């Protein structure tokens, strides 16, 4: 009898906030749904449309909003990890071309253990209905 396929989380509702041409950092938002029986650790973000990507957390420190690089984030078993404005988000750096509203961009999350989860993110001015806002 064969081994059961590994459980893989799903990346959905992905979007990137549109920005003026020449902008060097764009924010990406999505929901990582983890239907697995164990938590998963998100280690990195990559996209062929950007030179590099990072995971950032926004925190209020002494009344000031600050972003910091997060080396790893956890999506709980049977739960989700939300990347949303004002909170944890994907910082996509140095676009390889100017992106305009309506463009679709592949984005990939790298999980601990080597699993990769990917989706197309739409470039938008505002969050789509029922998305990571």
Specify the residue positions occupied by each region the protein language model found.
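Compact, glycine-rich, soluble single-domain proteins
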Residues: 1-133
């Amino acid at each position: 009898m064969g081994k059961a396929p590994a459980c893989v989380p799903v990346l959905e509702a992905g979007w990137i906030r549109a920005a003026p041409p020449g902008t060097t950092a764009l924010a990406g938002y999505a929901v990582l749904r983890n239907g697995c029986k164990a938590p998963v650790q998100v280690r990195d973000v990559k996209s062929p449309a950007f030179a590099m990507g990072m995971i950032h957390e926004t925190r209020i420190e002494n009344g000031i909003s600050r972003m910091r690089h997060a080396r790893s984030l956890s999506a709980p078993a049977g739960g989700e990890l939300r990347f949303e404005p004002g909170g944890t988000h994907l910082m996509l750096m140095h676009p390889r071309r100017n992106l305009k509203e309506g463009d679709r961009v592949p984005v990939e999350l790298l999980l601990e253990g080597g699993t990769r989860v990917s989706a197309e993110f739409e470039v938008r001015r505002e969050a789509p209905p029922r998305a990571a806002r």
